[in-house]
Amino acid sequence: MKEKVTAVVLAAGKGSRMHSDIQKQYMTLLERPVITYALEAFEDSSVDEVILVVAPGEVEYAQKNILDKYSYKKVKRIVTGGAERYHSVYEALCVIPEENYVLIHDGARAFITPELIEFCIEQVKKYKSCVMGIPVKDTIKIVDDNCYAVSTP
């Protein structure tokens, strides 16, 4: 059997730190939901298929407002996630054949590119495991208990 690469895009999170009624992955960024940028990057990569993981009760919403509206061909299945991220990953892994390579991506992270995806695929095939990280570009401030900036690393 041909080795396939499956991407799991996690979109079941609540984004509670955002203090918004709209989950991060569904917020609008330049007139499109944030999650569409990640899905488009996987669509434009050599990934064979995508499994989208959404919160309970959101399957119909994701199908209509994301998949149908933007016509993603590689999203083969929508899976309902769990209470925690690891539950959602587990639910997706349960529907993927063992011989597949698996990439896991947070759907609220819009700035993944097909080039980064290809790099991950190369590395996971070579080393059997890969974690992608990119340098922080924003200024980071360390604050004290009263939220006063105390230093910039």
Predicted segments — roles?
Residues K2-V59:
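N-terminal glycine-rich phosphate-binding loop and ensuing alpha1 helix
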Residues A7-V9, L52, I104, S129-M132:
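Structural beta-sheet core signal
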Residues D68-A83:
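Conserved donor nucleotide-binding strand/loop of the catalytic core
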Residues V9, I35, A92, H105-D106, ...:
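Residue-level signal for inorganic ion chemistry
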Residues E60-I66:
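Acidic helix N-cap motif at the loop->helix transition within catalytic regions
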Residues H87-Y101:
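Active-site nucleotide-sugar/metal-binding loop of Leloir-type enzymes
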Residues T36, G82, Y86-Y90, P114:
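Glycine-rich phosphate-binding loop at the start of an alpha helix
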Residues I112-P153:
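Conserved core of the sugar-phosphate nucleotidyltransferase
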